[in-house]
Amino acid sequence: MINLEIPKHLKGVASMAHDIAQGMFRPISRKYDKAEHTYPSELDTLGAILQGLDEGGSQLGADGLSRKDKKKDNKNRNGRNMGTVLNVAELCWGDLGLMLTIPGQGLGNAAIAAVATPEQKERFQGKWASMAITEPGAGSDSANIQTTARLDGEEWVLNGEKIYVTCGERSDLVVVWATLDKAQGRAAIKSFVVEKGTPGLEVARLDKKLGIRASDTATILLNDCRIPRNNLLGSEEIDVKKSFAGAMKTFDNTRPAVAAMALGVAKAALDLTRELLRKEGIKAEYQESLYESHTIEAEIYRMEAEWEAARLLTLKAAWMADNNIPNSMHASMCKAKAGKSANDITLKCVELCGGLGYSEELMLEKWARDSKITDIFEGTQQIQRLIIARQLLGKSSKELR
């Protein structure tokens, strides 16, 4: 039976994350929104602090879905994946861009946690890993990746271009998706760890963005980039039956984390909007029936219901990961729901607060800009719906066209 009760130790760590969001992120949030591509030096010590909170699941995808070293038992666990979504939501209540910029907490770390061997995990421990999947000609079609990996003796040779790599300039490692054989389709797609400073790896440019400006977004070029053979994550074997399930398993961890990012930003907007409306005498405290409520109160109730639904889906996906239950469909469900809800909530909060909400006097306009990325990266709304349909109907993407 599903258990979404939050253990006491996870509540404590989430409370610490909230304190960081309030005391460290909020005061510098606007500064780095305006100073895009400037590294927030205030975060230098924070990565080390969060490493110390690892038992509470402070890392993105900290436990991984497929930890084969765990013995199966009948215990109902709420562990590090649950801790991850709780902490990420709290940190993003402070600032989503700054959360993405915390050293050692990159989306690539989740890929390593999901499919790396114990030796690889030890070798890459403590290093900040970004994720390089998207390409100019592929977009959301991950199966159409053109970046290649060719085995030459005891080295892989990588060639290709990756775009929209979050923290691609600042990270220590880049987890690159590449194909071993284009003719084999998606089954040949694997993920590789490339260390910064490796000859042939180049950060070509940084992009200007609508939101999350505290984090850098890079274009990365790979030109005969050679890495050790044991930097491949997962098996070298091309298994047509398994397709690229090993590489895709990463998303089972990162999508609930992205959903948590959306929850944090939406909660920030809701909290501030409630506070502003309360000052105007609109309390929205569930003391009257809906038909007797102020129109604005009804909007608040609707948004809070949407937020709570997204939160429960996210907690369920995390709970499934903690209990070694396949959660691909639920990871997509929570990501789709939370991303869309965050977009709707933050924009509605701007609207409810009128000119004040639209101005830079408040953070509402920034949160509306920041929230949009949660509906795009790690798979767009349309991609999530396609995945959910595939799982529910038992059909391939081609059959659903």
Give residue spans per PLM region.
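Amphipathic, small/basic residue-rich leader segments at the start of a protein or domain
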Residues: 1-102, 123, 395-401
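Glycine-rich phosphate/cofactor-binding loops in nucleotide/flavin-utilizing enzymes
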Residues: 2-3, 87, 353-401
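Glycine-rich beta->alpha junctions and the first turn(s) of the following alpha-helix
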Residues: 2-15, 204-307, 374, 399-401
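C-terminal helix-coil-helix/basic helical segment that borders enzyme active sites and/or dimer interfaces
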Residues: 26-37, 277-278, 282, 304-337, ...
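Short Gly/Pro-enriched turn/cap motifs at secondary-structure boundaries
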Residues: 101, 137-140, 164-166, 183, ...
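A short, Trp-centered hydrophobic/proline-enriched beta-strand micro-motif
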Residues: 126-135
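A structural signal for short hydrophobic beta-strand segments in well-ordered beta-sheet cores
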Residues: 149-150
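A short core secondary-structure module
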Residues: 155, 159-203
